[in-house]
């Protein structure tokens, strides 16, 4: 089946496009009711790779199609991981066009996933994008001249994960403070005996 849906975001196309390029965009757009969890987001919309976790230990690997990429206007992701690739046969084209009221965002999906499931997911994505972009516009006068570096505790929880994603899509750098096994972009900390240099280079602690 195929599904095409469009909506207008009240912001310039360049701003909406840039928002999608930032780490955290995928997390912000993933519905909490969907059985998927973002693991890594592509560092490039042109030819990067995104990984999502599914139930039963399965992974959804989406590769971006360079041949259908137009900077500022269009990017495409295709599911490439077995067995999901055969089951879903997923291809998603994201398009951005100038509109008198801002940006016309069009999502075109070709897949075997039932349409009923997709409609609720894309309705959530549309409203979330509008809400996030509108929020950034409302606080624009409060934004610092230079991006901040924010250390976040509890970043693996529902609220912490959402906050971290919102900060990065706003252009700030987030350092996650974790108890063990830190990955790139994370720092290990002991809340009872933190390292003296734990917050080096950090502007804000949450």
Regions found by a protein language model. Name each.
Residues 27-28, 32-35, 41-45, 49-112:
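Hydrophobic-ligand binding "helix-grip"
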Residues 109-146:
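A conserved amphipathic terminal alpha-helix motif
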Residues 177-181, 191:
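N-terminal Rossmann-fold cofactor-binding loop
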Residues 187-204:
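Conserved Rossmann-fold cofactor-binding substructure of NAD(P)-dependent oxidoreductases
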Residues 148-170:
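N-terminal Rossmann NAD(P)H-binding glycine-rich loop of SDR-like oxidoreductase domains
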Residues 1-43:
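Hydrophobic ligand-binding cavity/cleft-lining segments
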Residues 104, 149, 173:
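Residues at the starts of beta-strands that form the adenosine-phosphate
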């Amino acid at each position: 089946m195929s599904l095409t849906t469009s909506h207008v975001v009240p912001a310039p196309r360049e701003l909406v496009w840039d928002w999608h390029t930032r780490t955290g965009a995928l997390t912000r757009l993933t519905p909490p009711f969907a059985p998927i969890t973002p693991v890594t987001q592509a560092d490039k919309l042109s030819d990067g790779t995104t990984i999502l976790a599914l139930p039963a230990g399965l992974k959804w690997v989406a590769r971006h199609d360079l041949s259908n990429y137009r900077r500022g206007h269009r990017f495409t992701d295709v599911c490439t991981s077995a067995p999901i690739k055969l089951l879903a046969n997923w291809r998603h084209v994201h398009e951005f066009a100038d509109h008198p009221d801002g940006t016309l965002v069009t999502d075109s999906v070709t897949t075997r996933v039932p349409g009923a499931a997709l409609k609720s997911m894309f309705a959530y994505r549309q409203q979330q994008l509008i809400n996030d972009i509108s929020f950034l516009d409302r606080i624009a006068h409060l934004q610092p001249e230079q991006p901040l570096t924010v250390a976040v505790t509890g970043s693996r929880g529902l609220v912490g994960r959402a906050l971290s994603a919102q900060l990065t899509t706003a252009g700030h750098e987030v350092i996650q403070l974790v108890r063990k096994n830190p990955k790139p972009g994370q720092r290990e900390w002991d809340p009872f005996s933190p390292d003296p240099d734990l917050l080096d280079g950090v502007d804000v602690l949450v």
